[in-house]
Structures are given as structure tokens and as C-alpha cells.
């Protein structure tokens, strides 16, 4: 097995872990802010320590895009990473949909319709993102800012000249993902990751009356713009010149 194939497999598995536990927790706790934030943060720590030495554990097209802009990836490798991340996200959401079909959200008998309906202990929207009470510009701005901060942290801790910081980079990245979720969940549900948003948006079409797929472009464009700005700011303003 060649190194590039191993990287792609690592990205599939790492993204699966992130989406399965992050979006799964959002579903089964009705998007409890603290629980969901911690689930995403801890998941990325676990995935980064597990797969970081193989692929760098991007687990996110926005992160890979920042690396492409920064000159750390070639275009063909970037495309392979993104495809792998999307596959991992869809696999995780697919498993969550099977759990829902098996009654993981509980079942309530609808007397009027005369059938079981999913209800009760969770939310069947698969952790899909949405505009909340904002318009598209507000949601887009939130995603750009949150992704900018998140990706800027990733670039700097993984490039740090301090060995202690670099060694524990997954922990800092996990903390960063946790705190952007603490703010963002009540605004957009927090994406900062196009793959994490695309899969739930498609699976949640029925539960959201189509709004999840109609709004998903914001959660693709916003994170990519935020990542681009982060790579640019780091390159121009923060990186030490040799």
C-alpha cells in the first residue's frame, strides 16, 4: 500500500470519528451546547493522535485548502483528501441514519397517522447546520470568523518551533474546536468543516423540509473563505521570515 493511499484511508477514518461522535452527540442530546462542543473537541483530539502521523489528520476540506494555499499540498493530493473526508462524513452519517431507523431516537405512536414516528430523546436532523435566526450573510460571517480562528490555531501549533506545543498540537486543536462550537452552536450549529456539513444536510432533507440542503452552500463557502484568510494572514503577518 503506498503512502498516499494510507493518507486517504486515514482521512476517511479520522473524519468518520469526528462526524460520528460530533454529529451523533448533537442528535442524541438535542444539540446540548456543552456536550456537543466537547464531543467535537475530544473526537478531533483522538483522531489527530491516531492518524496525525499518517495524514496530518486534516479531517476537514477547509484545513486541507489552507494547506494548499500555504503551499504544503499539491492540487491532486488536496482533491484526494477532500474526497476522502467527504466519504468519511457520509459513512458516519449513514451509520447514524441506521441507528435512527433502529429506534435510537425513540418512537412515539402517532394516533392520527396510525403509525410510529421518530421523536422524543433526540433530533433527527443529523446535526445539520442552519441559519438559525440570522440571514445568510450573518451565518456566512459567523462561519468565516470561526473557521479563520480554528484554522489559524491549527497552522500555528503544528508549525510551532516549541517541541512541547507541537507534540501536544492535537490538544490545542481540540480546545479550539470546542470553543468555536461553544459560541457557534446557537448561531449556525457550527460547521467550520464543509464535509461535516454536506453529509448531514443531505440526510436531513426530510427532517428540515429541504432547508438543510438549500442553506448548505454557506457552510461550504464560509469555511473555505475563513481557511483562505487564515493561511494568508499566517503567511504574511505571523510566520517568521527565514
Residue ranges and their predicted role:
Residues 1-242:
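Membrane-interface helix-loop junctions and terminal tails of multi-pass membrane proteins
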